[in-house]
Every structure is written in structure tokens, then in C-alpha cells.
From Swiss-Prot:
Its EC number is 3.1.1.120. It was not possible to determine the kinetic constants for the hydrolysis of L-fucono-1,5-lactone because of chemical instability, and thus, a stable mimic (4-deoxy-L-fucono-1,5-lactone) was utilized. GO terms for molecular function: hydrolase activity. Keywords: Carbohydrate metabolism, Hydrolase. Belongs to the metallo-dependent hydrolases superfamily. It catalyses: L-fucono-1,5-lactone + H2O = L-fuconate + H(+); L-fucono-1,4-lactone + H2O = L-fuconate + H(+); D-arabinono-1,4-lactone + H2O = D-arabinonate + H(+); L-xylono-1,4-lactone + H2O = L-xylonate + H(+). This is L-fucono-1,5-lactonase. Catalyzes the hydrolysis of L-fucono-1,5-lactone to L-fuconate. Can also hydrolyze L-fucono-1,4-lactone, L-galactono-1,4-lactone D-arabinono-1,4-lactone and L-xylono-1,4-lactone. It holds the Pfam family Amidohydro_2.
Length: 276
């Protein structure tokens, strides 16, 4: 099964999607499953993992309802308040939602880089692990030092780094530090990495495929091709590339260097991680 391990749906309104910038008009509209079904079908994608875009229980419920209607959705990564005293009760209420695979918090949007190290947040993550839910770690590269500290406390939890931790591909600044942190994180065998979100960290209008090769080299070398999964980050990727383009960037790289692991990167790893 060919899997896109990272995409979003939303009913757009400016209040709830304030992270969408003034010059990002392509994202200022509704994105529902039928639009992605057409893209997926044209590019041989059999299923997707839809990931939260708003930090609300209501959105998580909405994504679960979409998964009941659209077989393309194989897994849901929702949002829950990890520091809420009623977290356990909320997780218990979802126990029969088999398509709900894990959760994500928009850590990249937290002004305090140590937000993820708060004891209550860490305890919430540990409770997710007890319920056998995965966790998507959405951070900027500058937050990698804190992420390393966090991951040291979660040696068994299935965790995936979203968007290769968002290095500054456009300028190339900070590459050495990003590389060192990613190599250290990859030593945790429970941690995976999504090859996703790269085009929007590059120069939107004039990126070249070669821009991404040093970053993919680091990720594949550090994590190995059995802990890396492809994600399109559709529709956000459309700020810089088409759906087939983001697939081709990774596909050509894998075909050239890891041809025997193509099915892993484009499906098997996501199936194993999310238990699709």
C-alpha cells in the first residue's frame, strides 16, 4: 500500500487559521478529501494519514468523521490537551476509534522553547504511550536541543519528527547544528522521521531538487531507510510545489540510492509506525 503519511484537511476561516500568512492565498480555502482523492489517484497513492491543523478536540472529532466517510484516510493524528487533568478520560472516550493513531501539538508555535519539557506535558506524553498512541513532534530546528532532552525521557514511545525538523533550506544556515542534532536523535530506535515539508522551507519560487539532497542524505544516513516515511504536507506544499513534484523529489532520491527500500519509505514504514 502506497501511503502519504502527512496531509491536512480544513474548512478555512481566518480566525482559526491565523498561521496562514497574508501572501499564502492558495491555502485560504477549504480543503476536503475529494480534492486529495483526485491527486492521490493520479499519483498511485492508496491511503493517507491526516494530521491536525487546529488545536481543538472538535477538529479531531471532525477528522475522525471524515475517516468514516472516505476510505483514503487510513489514520488520523489528532490533537488533545496533554496537560488537561481530564486527559485520561478523553483518551478513554476514543478507545473504540481504531483509525485514531496518535496526536500532535504545534510545538513550533510555542514561544517558550522549553514548553515541551514541562513535567505535565511530559506526563501527558507518557499517558499517550500507555494508550499506545503515537506522537508527531512538530518543531523548528532551533528547538532540537529541547527535543533531544524530551526524547531521552521517552525511550519506548513511537515518535516521529515532522518535516525533518524544519531546517532553513532556503539559506542553508544552521545545517551543521541541525545535522548533529538529527544524528543524535536518530540513535533513539523508537524515533522515526518524516521526509515532508521540505519545499516550504526552501525558496518557494526557485528551489532546485539538488537543494534537498544534503538534507535527505543526513536523514537517510542517520535514521536508515526503515525509519523514514514520505509525507506530502498537502495542501501546504502547494505554496512551493505541486503534489506530484513533492512525491518525485523523494521518489527519485530513493530510487537512485535506496531502490530496495522504496516500498518502505512510501508505505511500509508508515504502516508499521502508525499500525495502519
Amino acid at each position: 500500500m502506497r501511503i502519504d503519511a502527512h496531509q491536512h484537511f480544513w474548512a478555512y476561516n481566518p480566525e482559526e487559521f491565523d498561521w496562514i500568512g497574508e501572501d499564502e492565498g492558495v491555502l485560504k480555502r477549504d480543503y476536503f478529501p475529494p480534492a486529495l482523492e483526485a491527486e492521490a489517484g493520479a499519483n498511485g497513492v492508496d491511503g493517507t494519514v491526516v494530521v491536525q491543523a487546529r488545536q481543538s478536540i472538535e477538529e479531531t472529532q471532525w477528522l475522525l468523521s471524515l475517516a468514516q466517510q472516505f476510505p483514503l484516510i487510513k489514520g488520523v493524528v489528532g490533537w488533545v490537551d496533554l496537560m488537561n487533568p481530564s486527559l485520561e478520560q478523553q483518551l478513554l472516550s476514543w478507545q473504540n476509534e481504531q483509525v485514531l493513531k496518535g496526536f500532535r501539538h504545534v510545538l513550533q508555535g510555542e514561544p517558550d522553547p522549553n514548553f515541551m519539557l514541562q513535567p505535565r506535558f511530559v506526563e501527558g506524553l507518557k499517558l499517550l504511550h500507555q494508550f499506545d498512541y503515537t506522537y508527531d513532534l512538530l518543531i523548528f530546528a532551533a528547538q532540537l536541543p529541547q527535543a533531544r532532552q524530551l526524547l531521552d525521557t521517552l525511550p519506548q514511545h513511537r515518535i516521529v519528527i515532522d518535516h525533518i525538523a524544519k531546517p532553513d533550506i532556503a539559506s542553508g544556515e544552521g545545517f551543521a547544528q541541525w545535522k548533529a542534532h538529527m544524528q543524535a536523535i536518530a540513535e533513539h530506535q523508537n524515533v522515526y522521521c518524516k521526509i515532508s515539508g521540505m519545499v516550504t522551507e526552501a525558496s518557494h519560487k526557485d528551489w532546485q531538487e539538488a537543494d534537498f539532497i544534503p538534507y535527505m542524505d543526513v536523514v537517510f544516513s542517520a535514521f536508515g531507510p526503515e525509519r523514514v516515511m514520505f509525507g506530502s504536507d498537502w495542501p501546504v506544499c502547494q505554496l512551493a510545489a505541486t503534489y506530484p513534484e513533492v512525491i518525485q523529489i523523494v521518489e527519485r532520491y530513493v530510487t537512485r540510492l535506496y531502490p530496495e527500500f522504496s516500498q518502505h519509505v512510501f508505505g511500509l514504514n508508515a504502516e508499521r509506525f502508525y499500525r495502519l
